[in-house]
Amino acid sequence: MAATLLDVCAVVPAAGFGRRMQTECPKQYLSIGNKTILEHSVHALLAHPRVTRVVIAISPGDHRFAQLPLADHPQITVVDGGNERADSVLAGLQAVAEAQWVLVHDAARPCLHQDDLARLLAISENSRVGGILASPVRDTMKRGEPGKNAIAHTVERADLWHALTPQFFPRELLHDCLTRALNEGATITDEASALEYCGFHPALVEGRADNIKVTRPEDLALAEFYLTRTIHQEKA
């Protein structure tokens, strides 16, 4: 029987540091406008009426989150994250044991559009596995020689997608797949890869390519541009 349009909980793993940003401040706490990247990311989730609760997994030594307005938000729960992303997601899943479906969203992905989120959430009407936001690969892709800055070969880009977030799955299925994959030593780079490891095939829901993750210093200005443009479009 297909799932109905039930309320959804979200998990945001925010315990990482992001050393590629070359800053002393964890990237999720860098500011764009008058909000941190984390606040932009979380507010995009809470803007959808189906998302009733957001669990944020932070580092046990994190002293920055308590200073944000988010810390007092009634729909937000904070848990201690782990050393790896999967550990933080599992900690978040434990806090929403009553949820049937969960979103997992990157703390440093602040440019999520509401129409993309709505399309992703709609798959719960006829899916038992879930899916992810993704964008088709547009550039020519090259495989590098191991340990060298040299091209090994060109990778056929047909059917290649950039995996984005949020990713959206039945809570119990995601919990079981993450647990099994970690116990068996599998390499888990996102939540969908845990389901793939266990033999499932999540759906690809095409999303906007400007739903970027802030990873490098130059991404900050780009994210600010996208967010400013979106605000102006909403006011128009």
From Swiss-Prot:
Matching Gene3D superfamilies: Spore Coat Polysaccharide Biosynthesis Protein SpsA, Chain A
Cross-referenced Pfam families: IspD
Enzyme class name: transferase
Residues the record marks as site: Positions MEP for the nucleophilic attack: R157, K213
GO molecular function: 2-C-methyl-D-erythritol 4-phosphate cytidylyltransferase activity
The protein's assembly and partners: Homodimer.
Protein name listed in UniProt: 2-C-methyl-D-erythritol 4-phosphate cytidylyltransferase
Organism from which the protein derives: Salmonella newport (strain SL254)
Gene that this sequence comes from: ispD
